[in-house]
């Protein structure tokens, strides 16, 4: 027996609500896991994985879920308020990422090691730079008068697309970091595979949210 359109809609909405809730928990859980693993304060390097996971796993995920109609923690507030909260979270994520990047550069300088010799380091640098550009571009949406010649609809489309790319870059950086000697020396077996699934899961949830709630809608408009 075929399901009605209304039933399918309810099922799909329930699945998106469940996946959004899972993304909240996974983003927080992964960040806590890395913090426990790194023991921040035990060394200069120990702050790097903590700050980067805080930036790209927790803060950035929460910033994007802010616009989810099913799983936003502030969905009862107006879109304008949520947009400002989104920008604040993104700015905090950028600050954490910059600090994490600066500390690992200082750590390598102290050890006399070369910089950006791994895919993880290269992806991380690109993700931080992209996050900086994304935060700057967000100013145009917070204050549209700064870009009077650009249609607001196009700005939103570009920002959503660019934001998704930036989020995926950050997730890729986290994923590549789990192949590092520091991580694999401590986390092995099933725990390693579970950790790898964390940025993959949150990326899938964010991709679904952005593409279905915004990008797909833009494509089908005449």
Swiss-Prot record:
Q: How is the cofactor bound?
A: Binds 2 heme b groups non-covalently.
Q: Looking at the record's lineage, which domain of life comes first? A: Eukaryota
* Segments on the Cytoplasmic side according to the record's topology features: 2-17, 68-85, 144-162, 208-222
A GO term from the CC aspect:
vesicle
> What EC numbers are recorded for this enzyme?
7.2.1.3
Q: What keywords were assigned to this record?
A: Cytoplasmic vesicle, Electron transport, Endoplasmic reticulum, Heme, Iron, Membrane, Metal-binding, Translocase, Transmembrane, Transmembrane helix, Transport
Main localization category: endoplasmic reticulum
Cofactors that this protein relies on: heme b
Q: Which protein is depicted?
A: Transmembrane reductase CYB561D2
Protein species of origin? Mus musculus
Provide the gene name from the record: Cyb561d2
């Amino acid at each position: 027996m075929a399901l009605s359109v209304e039933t399918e809609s309810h099922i799909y909405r329930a699945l998106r609500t469940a996946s959004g809730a899972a993304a909240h928990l996974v983003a927080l859980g992964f960040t806590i896991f890395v913090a426990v693993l790194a023991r921040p304060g035990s060394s200069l390097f120990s702050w790097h994985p903590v700050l980067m996971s805080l930036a790209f796993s927790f803060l950035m995920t929460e910033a994007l879920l802010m616009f989810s109609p099913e799983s936003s923690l502030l969905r009862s507030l107006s879109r304008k308020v949520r947009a400002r909260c989104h920008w604040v979270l993104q700015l905090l994520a950028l600050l954490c990422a910059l600090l994490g990047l600066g500390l690992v550069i200082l750590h390598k300088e102290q050890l006399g090691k070369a910089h950006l010799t791994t895919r993880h380091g290269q992806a991380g640098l690109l993700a931080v730079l992209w996050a900086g550009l994304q935060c700057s571009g967000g100013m145009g949406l917070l204050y549209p008068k700064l870009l009077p010649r650009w249609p607001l609809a196009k700005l939103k489309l570009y920002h959503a697309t660019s934001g998704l790319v930036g989020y995926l870059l950050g997730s890729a950086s986290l994923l590549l970091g789990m192949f590092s000697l520091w991580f694999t020396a401590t986390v092995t077996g099933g725990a390693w595979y579970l950790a790898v699934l964390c940025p993959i899961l949150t990326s899938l949830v964010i991709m679904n949210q952005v593409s279905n709630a915004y990008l797909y809608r833009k494509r089908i408009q005449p």
